[in-house]
Regions:
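Forkhead-associated
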Residues: 1, 60, 74-76, 80-120
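Short coil-to-beta-strand transition motifs
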Residues: 67-72
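Conserved metal-binding segment of the jelly-roll/cupin
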Residues: 121-125
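Short, solvent-exposed loop/turn motifs
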Residues: 6, 38, 106-107, 127
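A short beta-strand motif that forms part of the nucleic acid-binding face
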Residues: 54, 93-95, 106, 127, ...
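Intrinsically disordered, low-complexity acidic Ser/Thr-rich regulatory segments
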Residues: 1-66, 78-88, 132-134
């Protein structure tokens, strides 16, 4: 099985459009790299625990990747609506071993940072981009 990737291949019929989900809470776009393929993962209201997909790990936003520098519970994006009805996104570290980076700045273990549409986050060697909902 030498050279066989543990990460599944992208199927031709798989829809990789970055359109928002029906719920409209936005999504994260995982940038393709040597560890994995492009993925568009919808976000839900409340805490979205993001990390490396692994059997037995309980997270609601798993990323399929071979990137071992990404923790199984790496960071959390909280999605909620403010009083005006606008979606507010807050990023925090889980905490992770390698740290969570927002625009190449590392977050501390206690940091809570508001993020906007197009925010670039780095988890281990994997980069993700926030696509905000309406």
């Amino acid at each position: 099985r030498l050279g066989k990737s543990k990460v599944k291949a992208v199927r031709k019929e798989e829809d990789l459009s970055e359109e928002l989900t029906d719920e409209g809470f936005g999504s994260i776009v995982v940038i393709a790299n040597v560890f994995g393929f492009k993925q568009v993962i919808p976000l839900a209201e409340g805490d979205n625990v993001i990390g490396r997909r692994c059997v037995g790990t309980v997270i609601n936003t798993p990323i399929e990747t071979g990137d071992m520098s990404m923790d199984r519970r790496h960071c959390i994006i909280n999605v909620k609506r403010n009083k005006a009805g606008k979606l507010v996104y807050t990023l925090r570290d889980a905490p992770s071993l390698t740290g969570t980076f927002l625009h190449n700045e590392v977050l501390g273990d206690k940091d809570r940072v508001r993020i906007e549409d197009g925010a670039i986050m780095t988890l281990g060697a994997t980069s993700i981009i926030l696509k905000a909902g309406k």
